[in-house]
């Protein structure tokens, strides 16, 4: 009724997996010695973008770990680099980003380069579980992450994506959390999220937690 009967695809482009958080379920966590760290150089970023354009992609989501190196200015610069790449008549017309929550000024910086959707997942809306699974790092602050989208709205970014990682807690509770998060944004800002995501935990290198998540979610669920 709103978007029509269509499916829109976007390709993921991981810019860097450096991270100072220690999320129990994540292969990128700082304590995971098996994770090989890398951040794309400008030339590498251009090459990746050209390869995606050659495959016909026009929409990307750029993904960043949470690390001082990935500042709002760095994110804005990498987004602009992608927009500038025109290869064999291809171009990226929309760059969405998945990055750590910022302050309002940080969000204004990334907005200035014309991002599409800003996406951030709460992971779990169950606060006690959240604290157990995020023992250290900036992401350990439940409320800072929860109200990240409020700050994005205040910065003028009204195209947002929310989500919960299924398997961390009871999926029915998480669905309720997603719905109430949507209601909160609609009531405060007059607009809800553009997208709602519900990925499931998948195995990650050096991460035993992912092999047997406490709240497995089936296809039927």
Regions found by a protein language model. Give the residues of each.
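N-terminal pre-triad scaffold of radical SAM enzymes
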Residues: 2-32, 37-63, 116
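Short helix-terminating capping/connector loops at secondary-structure junctions
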Residues: 2-5, 88-93, 189-192
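Active-site beta-loop-alpha junctions enriched in small/polar residues
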Residues: 14, 65-67, 98-102, 123-125, ...
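Radical SAM/AdoMet-radical enzyme domain recognition
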Residues: 23, 59-60, 72-165
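Glycine-rich tight-turn/loop motif centered on a GG-T
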Residues: 31-39, 68-73, 130-142, 209-218
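Active-site loop-helix segments enriched in His/Asp/Glu that coordinate
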Residues: 37-50, 67-83, 107-108
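Conserved C-terminal portion of the radical SAM core fold
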Residues: 117, 143-207, 219-221
